[in-house]
Design a protein with these regions (language model features):
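Short intracellular "coupling" helices and adjacent cytoplasmic loop segments at the cytosolic face
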Residues: 2-11, 102, 110-140, 213-237, ...
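ABC-type nucleotide-binding domain
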Residues: 339, 345-594
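Hydrophobic alpha-helical transmembrane segments of ABC transporter permease domains
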Residues: 37, 45, 49, 68, ...
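Helix-loop-helix
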Residues: 62-64, 68-77, 167-181, 251-324, ...
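Alpha-helical transmembrane segments of multi-pass membrane proteins
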Residues: 37-38, 82-101, 152-159, 178-204, ...
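Transmembrane helix-loop-helix hairpins at lipid-water interfaces of multipass membrane proteins
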Residues: 32-92, 169-174, 285-289
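A short amphipathic helical element positioned immediately N-terminal to and/or at the very start
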Residues: 14-29, 132
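An intracellular "coupling" helix at the cytosolic face of ABC transporter transmembrane type-1 domains
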Residues: 29-30, 121-122, 138-147, 151, ...
Length: 594
């Protein structure tokens, strides 16, 4: 299924992509200049050999200078020196030139990752992680070869073609014009076939992204797959994606075969012209045997150059595709960013105010929140309840600006959040979610995420406050225990308490609890609930409640529904009204009600 940010929807011209790439190349212009100088040296060596052979052949046949052993030795010495120069130049081109390409690839990947960090939730909701991974890893691998070889190959080709043309014209202008008459036609055919080749490579990149996403889903969801005995369904999904990739790659090789075949046909045509026209010129005395030998060698050099460009075409198109997919990331607009007049959020107790706030998701024009006005006192514990889709999570996500309001404004301690920096805003907000995400690393690393550079003493104290120290010390390596990918080695309750410790370490004045205990067993819920009580003390706390029994003692409860805030009050006040909250409470007291 086509995604919103699928690269198939874009087709950027080669010129535009080259212009996009040039600033990265310009950063290493000194290295590039030396690389091109070395390329010129290797080209000079290749061009001189036919001239040496022409001199020897003509001398042997009595044309020009008399051939002697001394002349042969001098020519051999010249060629030997040139080959030493060629070897040194090739070493630099192969080593330093490739390293330059690696540096450029690294710079581009850094910029792509930095831009991805700035993109909002909407982008990630509409783009598969496997596709994104492919773009910042595989797609940029080919840029290394492209960055090194593209300037080098075209520079060498330009020198050889121009030099060959001038030298061949000295031998025979009519013969040279006949040979070069094939070049424009070859260029036209090559451009057409190259366009088809690039389209195939673009399709391959798209499909490998889809395949990566399928594999990621299956592997990360192994618990669900095994629970439902759905291995056959997963094999079928993978087989389809794998087969689609095979088909697209096959089409790519057909396009490459057509490209290579057309080139070989033109090679043969150019040799045929030389054999016919050159042979007749020799018969009628228009050219010497030595010049014809040199002519054949220069034509061979010319054809070898063209073949090298043809062979580079695949690498060129892969590199262009990588740059194109890189550009697609970089051109994705950053919709949530600091305003020009943004200032750091001034420290305060954490009072929050919603003024006539409305919101709708960018890809859905149905309003989730309608003209919501709400005052949350500093230090107040506020619970949000109501049916799914009522806007509870959305309302909370607007406070740290995970999404932008489409109407009205939100203030924290009297400061409009649209005019404060995102970093300072989010540093003042701690979030504990139902689905805890732990990074691959140690327990200590994950707790320290709340305060980069925290000391071990601070980490341990945060764990103690979260009620996590005892179970952490019981682990094999204590705070240095590896938690596994996404924390798979820990239970749900243990992960929640580490997440709470992370927020304790962050120590923000505002706290958002998004159904933080709803997925836990009773024992874990009690332990985590106690940790959350400690965490919420003295902080402005918004809790999205899944179980009504956990919010009975809150300062205020809001019931959100299709019409916005339908009810507001304490637990006892709302029960006394016998409205929406009363009905929810009496559905299944003490159990999941929403």
């Amino acid at each position: 299924m086509q995604k919103v940010n699928d690269p198939a929807v874009r087709h950027t011209s080669s010129g535009a992509l080259i212009r996009r790439f040039l600033p990265y190349l310009a950063k290493y212009k000194k290295t590039l200049f030396i690389d091109l100088f070395c390329a010129a040296m290797t080209t000079l060596c290749d061009i001189i050999l036919p001239k040496i052979m022409s001199t020897i052949t003509n001398s042997a046949m009595g044309v020009g200078i008399t051939l002697t052993a001394g002349i042969v030795l001098k020519l051999a010495a010249v060629y030997f020196v040139l080959r030493i120069i060629d070897g040194a130049a090739q070493y630099f081109m192969s080593g330093i030139g490739h390293i330059m390409g690696v540096h450029i690839e690294t710079d581009m990947r850094r910029d792509a990752f930095d831009h991805l960090l700035k993109l909002d939730h909407t982008y990630y909701n509409n783009t598969k992680v496997g596709t994104i991974m492919g773009r910042i890893t595989n797609d940029l691998f080919d840029v290394t070869e492209f960055a090194h070889h593209c300037p080098e190959e075209f520079f060498i080709a330009g020198i050889k073609i121009i030099a060959s043309f001038l030298i061949l014209c000295q031998a025979s202008v009519p013969l040279t014009l006949a040979v070069f008459a094939c070049v424009p036609l070859m260029g036209i055919v090559s451009v057409k076939l190259n366009q088809r080749l690039r389209a195939r490579f673009r399709q391959q990149r798209i499909q490998i992204g889809e395949l990566n996403a399928t594999i990621e889903d299956s592997l990360l969801g192994q618990g669900v797959v095994k629970a439902f005995a759905a291995e056959d369904e997963e094999r079928e999904k993978f087989a389809k994606g794998n087969k689609d990739f095979e088909h697209i790659k096959t089409l790519g090789y057909y396009a490459m075969a057509a490209f290579n075949t057309s080139t070989r046909l033109f090679d043969g045509l150019m040799y045929l012209v030389v054999i016919l026209a050159g042979g007749l010129s020799l018969v009628y005395g228009k050219i010497t045997a030595g010049d014809l030998v040199a002519y054949m060698l220069y034509v061979t050099t010319l054809i070898a150059t063209i073949r090298r460009i043809v062979e580079f075409a695949e690498q060129f198109q892969r590199g262009m595709t990588g740059i194109e997919r890189f550009a697609e990331i970089m051109d994705t607009p950053v919709t949530i960013k600091d305003a020009e007049d943004a200032k750091p959020l001034q420290p305060g107790p954490g009072g929050i105010r919603f003024e006539d706030v409305s919101f709708e998701y960018p890809d859905d024009h149905n309003k989730v929140l309608h003209h919501v006005s709400l005052d949350i006192r500093a230090g107040e514990r506020l619970a949000l309840v109501g049916p799914s889709g009522g806007g509870k999570t959305t309302l909370c996500n607007l406070i740290p600006r995970f999404y932008e309001v489409t109407g009205g404004r939100i203030l924290i301690d009297g400061q409009d959040i649209q005019h404060v920096t995102l970093k300072s805003l989010r540093e003042d907000i701690g979030i504990v979610q139902q689905e805890v995400y732990l990074f691959s690393g140690s327990v200590a690393d994950n707790i320290a995420y709340g305060k980069p550079g925290a000391t071990r003493e601070e980490i341990v104290e945060a764990a103690r406050l979260a009620g996590a120290e005892r179970f952490i010390r019981a682990l094999k390596d204590g705070f240095d225990t590896y938690v596994g990918e996404r924390g798979v080695k820990l239970s749900g309750g243990q992960k929640q308490r580490i997440a709470i410790a992370r927020v304790f370490l962050k120590n923000p004045p505002i706290l958002i609890l998004d159904e933080a205990t709803s997925a836990l067993d009773n024992e874990s819920e009690i332990l985590v609930g106690q940790s959350l009580e400690k965490l919420a003390h003295g902080r402005t706390t918004l809790t999205i409640a899944h179980r009504l029994t956990t919010i009975k003692d809150y300062d205020r409860i809001l019931v959100l529904g299709a019409e916005g805030i339908e009810e507001s009050g304490t637990h006892d006040e709302l029960l006394a009204r016998k409205g929406v909250y009363y009905r929810l409470w009496n559905q299944l007291p003490g159990e999941d009600t929403l």
